């Protein structure tokens, strides 16, 4: 019985670790996309800015396509996965937030948040 408990805890911890790893990878992915599209990312209107509750964009600009693909990947990789991006135009500081439900890893409904900050 004790071994079963240890194995169960190990599985929960592995699932939580997997979520954090995926969040980190996906945050880095959108930052790489922004750097590849630096001219549009730094343009007036902040085309990459998106809040957690915003729907995914459906337009044809590179920024809109990047955000749509990123949000789709978040939703398919992480339970209830979503993300937000904000950029300070003056400092070029980008904050990427990834949020998901880690209830499998924590044993109850638990929204986890991963934040990555960098400069373009």
Where are these regions (language model features)?
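Alpha-helical hydrophobic helix detector
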Residues: 1-5
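Short, conserved catalytic or interaction motifs in soluble domains
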Residues: 8
């Amino acid at each position: 019985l004790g071994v079963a408990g240890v194995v169960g805890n190990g599985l929960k911890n592995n699932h939580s670790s997997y979520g954090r790893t995926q969040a980190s990878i996906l945050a880095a992915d959108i930052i790489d996309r922004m750097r590849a599209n630096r001219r549009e990312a730094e343009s007036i209107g902040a085309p990459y800015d998106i809040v957690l509750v915003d729907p995914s964009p459906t337009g044809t600009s590179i920024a809109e396509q990047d955000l749509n693909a990123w949000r789709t990947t978040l939703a398919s990789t992480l339970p209830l996965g979503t993300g937000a991006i904000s950029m300070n135009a003056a400092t070029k500081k980008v904050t990427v937030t990834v949020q998901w439900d880690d209830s499998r890893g924590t044993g109850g409904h638990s929204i986890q948040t991963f934040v990555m900050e960098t400069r373009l």
